[in-house]
Curated annotation (Swiss-Prot):
The keyword Nuclease does not apply. Its main location: membrane. GO terms for molecular function: complement receptor activity; G protein-coupled receptor activity. This is Probable G-protein coupled receptor 33. The gene is Gpr33.
Length: 339
């Protein structure tokens, strides 16, 4: 019996996603590889520019710090895309060794968890800034934001340890080396007991990833922005809702882009039919690539009207990511809040 394995991340294609010869069909393979290469080129340039502007050309504030780390998580993901694309072009053959198999997938997992955690942190920060302005003025500092960022990276790294443990390479006896998760605990892969245990471990890893990397952050973000929107409406502050629009754009783009990935992971877990799995895999790769490349651009253009685009790029960055509008709302709310 074959070992219990899964693509785990979209870096490899499950055996169920191939045609009768065991090789991914040419059209989806070419589309996926092209999307990954284009995302690498555009994402490296755009995210690199964002990081440079936020780090060296803007004032160090809570907002710029959180956005810097969010975009850093996107930038890390883009650096792995060429290796994924090469694997797809070589019929899912992994030519970079077992160490990089573990490292790249673990790094991709870290960036995934970090990005959703930073989106959650930004929404919670916006919640406190709008609904608890006095507390925010007393505690909301760049040093506080730096500590939050450090904890997020540590937590994302801890949650990604399973990819260092279970990810490995193996020969599929068809001339290809696969980089996949092996959830079998032990060397006796024929044992039904080990097969059952492996299936339970696979299910536990999927549940942990879906719960902590998607569902719970989604509920936190929805709650925070619902309360923020209600408060802003009550106080008539929607004219100053630029940061709110930026955050909402980030949230929508992230969850729309990551939903196909979690759907695909669920189909792999349940050993669904090949066609739905293949479609969701291709969609997941394209949407995740879209998320790492386009989301930062969306923040920029939803953060200010088109007239500001006629100004310098630096002015546009400052207008989008600065705390000025948030501070104005805080001062307005603070004047109406009883201490």
């Amino acid at each position: 019996m074959d070992r219990v394995n899964s693509s785990g991340h979209v870096i490899s294609v499950s055996p169920s996603l191939t045609n009768s010869t065991g090789v991914p069909t040419p059209a989806p393979k070419a589309i996926i590889a092209a999307a990954l290469f284009m995302s690498f080129i555009v994402g490296t340039i755009s995210n690199g520019l964002y990081l440079w502007m936020l780090k060296f050309k803007m004032q160090r504030t809570v907002n710029t710090l959180l956005f810097f780390h969010l975009i850093l998580s996107y930038f890390i993901s883009t650096l792995i895309l060429p290796f994924m694309a090469t694997s797809f072009l070589q019929d899912n053959h992994w030519a970079f060794g077992s160490v990089l198999c573990k490292v790249f997938n673990s790094t991709l997992s870290v960036s995934m968890f970090a990005s959703v955690f930073f989106l959650s942190a930004i929404s919670v920060d916006r919640y406190h800034l709008t609904l608890h302005p006095v507390w925010s003025q007393q505690h909301r500092t760049p040093r506080w934001a730096s500590r939050i960022a450090l904890r997020i990276w540590i937590l994302a790294t801890i949650l990604s340890i399973p990819y260092l443990v279970f990810r490995e390479t193996h020969d599929d006896h068809k001339g290809r080396i696969k980089c996949q998760n092996n959830y079998i605990v032990g060397t006796n892969w024929e044992s039904s007991e080990h097969q059952t245990l492996g299936q339970w471990i696979h299910a536990a890893c999927f549940g942990r990833r879906f719960l902590l990397g998607f569902l719970l952050p989604f509920l936190v973000i929805v709650f925070c922005y619902k309360r923020v929107a209600t408060k802003m409406k009550d106080k008539g502050l929607f004219k100053s809702s630029k940061p709110f629009k930026v955050m909402l754009t980030a949230v929508v783009s992230f969850f729309v882009c990551w939903m196909p990935y979690h759907v695909h992971s669920g189909l792999v877990l349940t050993k669904s039919q090949p066609l739905p799995s293949q479609l969701t895999l291709g969609l997941a790769v394209v949407t995740i690539s879209f998320n790492t490349v386009v989301s930062p651009i969306l923040y920029l253009f939803t953060g200010e009207n088109f007239e500001v685009f006629k100004k310098s790029i630096l002015a546009l960055f400052k207008s989008t990511f600065s705390d000025s509008s948030a501070t104005e709302r805080t001062q307005t709310l603070n004047s109406e809040t009883e201490i």
